[in-house]
């Protein structure tokens, strides 16, 4: 009994194994300065995106006097802010979406298999940690990494699966998808 407590709390397993399900990407690190009486005091701000590559993703911001501490704080913040995004076939979006934050706007389009991630900078980190394999994305306006990540999350927040749309409209998923194809329900059923 006492041996179980020493190894990490019984059935939970060691902390490293629990956290290994997440992939984290450092999006941006910024050196900031605070002016004090004796001069300038420097610190660092980090922006981290974390995800399980299966539809859960989050971002966090951390500030500290040293870079590793700022990254650790940002990672912890990202783990607290995880959101689930429905994916089509586990590889792309269900439909085209747009998001905005401040002066930054992003447009995300679903793509056929084999397209890859066509996105720049901070958006690519979000898609890689989310588990999206095929997407076309365009950012317009602000190129600030914080605005781009928040605009991408705003767009992903509006992503709906066919199941949730069908439930909202009191329809069956097959009826909804047959309308999308053009009324030919046999094509969808095959």
Curated annotation (Swiss-Prot):
GO terms for cellular component: small ribosomal subunit. Gene3D superfamilies: 3.30.160.20, 3.30.230.10. The keyword Ribonucleoprotein applies. InterPro entries: Ribosomal_Su5_D2-typ_SF, Ribosomal_uS5, Ribosomal_uS5_bac-type, Ribosomal_uS5_C, Ribosomal_uS5_N, Ribosomal_uS5_N_CS, Ribsml_uS5_D2-typ_fold_subgr. It holds the Pfam family Ribosomal_S5_C. One of its GO terms (biological process) is translation. One of its GO terms (molecular function) is structural constituent of ribosome. Disulfide bonds: none annotated. The keyword Cytoplasm does not apply. Residues 22-85 form the S5 DRBM domain. Keywords: Ribonucleoprotein, Ribosomal protein, RNA-binding, rRNA-binding. Part of the 30S ribosomal subunit. Contacts proteins S4 and S8. With S4 and S12 plays an important role in translational accuracy. Located at the back of the 30S subunit body where it stabilizes the conformation of the head with respect to the body. Belongs to the universal ribosomal protein uS5 family. The N-terminal domain interacts with the head of the 30S subunit; the C-terminal domain interacts with the body and contacts protein S4. The interaction surface between S4 and S5 is involved in control of translational fidelity. This is Small ribosomal subunit protein uS5.
């Amino acid at each position: 009994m006492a041996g179980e407590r020493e190894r990490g709390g019984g059935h939970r397993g060691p902390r490293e194994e629990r956290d290994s399900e997440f992939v984290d990407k450092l999006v941006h690190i910024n050196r900031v300065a605070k002016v004090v009486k004796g001069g300038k005091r420097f610190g660092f701000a980090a922006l981290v995106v974390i995800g399980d590559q299966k539809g859960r993703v989050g971002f966090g911001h951390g500030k500290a006097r040293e870079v590793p501490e700022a990254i650790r704080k940002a990672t912890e913040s990202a783990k607290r802010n995880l959101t689930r995004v429905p994916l089509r076939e586990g590889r792309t979006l269900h439909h085209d979406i747009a998001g905005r934050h401040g002066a930054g706007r992003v447009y995300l389009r679903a793509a056929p298999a084999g397209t890859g991630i066509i996105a720049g900078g901070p958006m690519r980190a979000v898609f890689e940690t989310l588990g999206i394999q095929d997407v076309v994305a365009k950012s317009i306006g602000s190129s600030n990494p914080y605005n781009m990540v928040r605009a991408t999350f705003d767009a992903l927040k509006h992503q709906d699966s066919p199941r949730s749309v069908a439930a909202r409209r009191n329809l069956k998923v097959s009826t909804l998808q047959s309308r999308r194809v053009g009324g030919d329900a046999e094509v969808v059923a095959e």
